[in-house]
């Protein structure tokens, strides 16, 4: 049975409505899927960018922290070096003053002679030989001769044998040193340096820890004490 024109139009309208409905639903489905994919991609990009920002911030923070530590360490080191330098200057001043005082003593015969006696006696006892010579400053020859007599007597009492002590008048000690003597054995191969500079040097090395402690107190970095 053939369809009338009205029936054909009705069927076409139905088909058109169905197609339009299907198209709208498909379009809606595509849009929803696209929106979903967009949100997923957007979230991924946001996470990626956030991670990148966090990483960059963390790196900058680490660099800033490292720079701060380096600066702090540098300042600390410079401060410690400055303190050490100041302490050394103070110690040098102390020993320079001590040397200056020694030079004053050598200008006073009454004070200097007992010092020479002790230095000569100590040097001769160290060598324990029957014949020695001593080197002195040229300006100390007279007082040294007097000191030799007393030092030889003291040596004999302690060593139980005599010693002959002579002054080396060909090899004087430098005029600008503080004073003291150098004792030389009979063969001329062994010397005992008992100049005031040498004695002050030895004293400074031995007394330095105690002087540091007295002046500056216990070291904050030292873990062990004698």
From Swiss-Prot:
Its main location: membrane. It is a peripheral membrane protein. Transmembrane segments: none annotated. GO terms for cellular component: fungal-type vacuole membrane; membrane raft; vacuolar proton-transporting V-type ATPase, V1 domain. Pfam families: vATP-synt_E. Keywords: Hydrogen ion transport, Ion transport, Membrane, Transport, Vacuole. It comes from the Eukaryota. It is found in: Vacuole membrane. GO terms for molecular function: proton-transporting ATPase activity, rotational mechanism. Gene3D superfamilies: 6.10.250.1620, ATP synthase, E subunit, C-terminal. Subunit of the V1 complex of vacuolar(H+)-ATPase (V-ATPase), a multisubunit enzyme composed of a peripheral complex (V1) that hydrolyzes ATP and a membrane integral complex (V0) that translocates protons. V-ATPase is responsible for acidifying and maintaining the pH of intracellular compartments. V-ATPase is a heteromultimeric enzyme composed of a peripheral catalytic V1 complex (components A to H) attached to an integral membrane V0 proton pore complex (components: a, c, c', c'', d, e, f and VOA1). Belongs to the V-ATPase E subunit family. PANTHER family: ATPASE H+-TRANSPORTING V1 SUBUNIT E1A-RELATED. This is V-type proton ATPase subunit E. It comes from Candida albicans. The lineage of its organism: Eukaryota, Fungi, Dikarya, Ascomycota, Saccharomycotina. The gene is VMA4.
């Amino acid at each position: 049975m053939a369809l009338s024109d009205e029936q054909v139009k009705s069927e076409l309208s139905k088909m058109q409505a169905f197609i339009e409905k299907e198209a709208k639903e498909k379009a809606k489905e595509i849009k929803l899927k696209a929106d979903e994919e967009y949100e997923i991609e957007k979230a991924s990009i946001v996470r990626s960018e956030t991670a990148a920002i966090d990483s960059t911030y963390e790196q900058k923070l680490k660099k800033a922290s490292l720079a701060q530590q380096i600066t702090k360490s540098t300042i600390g080191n410079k401060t410690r070096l400055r303190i050490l330098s100041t302490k050394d200057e103070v110690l040098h001043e102390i020993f320079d003053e001590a040397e200056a005082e020694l030079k004053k003593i050598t200008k006073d015969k009454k004070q200097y002679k007992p010092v020479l006696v002790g230095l000569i006696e100590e040097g001769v006892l160290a060598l324990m030989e029957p014949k020695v010579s001593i080197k002195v400053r040229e300006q100390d020859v007279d007082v040294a001769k007097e000191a030799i007599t007393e030092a030889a007597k003291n040596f004999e009492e302690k060593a139980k044998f005599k010693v002959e002590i002579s002054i080396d008048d060909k090899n004087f000690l430098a005029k600008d040193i503080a004073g003291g003597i150098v004792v030389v054995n009979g063969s001329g191969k062994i010397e005992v340096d008992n100049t005031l500079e040498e004695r002050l040097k030895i004293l400074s090395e031995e007394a330095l820890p105690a002087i540091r402690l007295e002046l500056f107190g216990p070291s904050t970095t030292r873990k062990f004490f004698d």
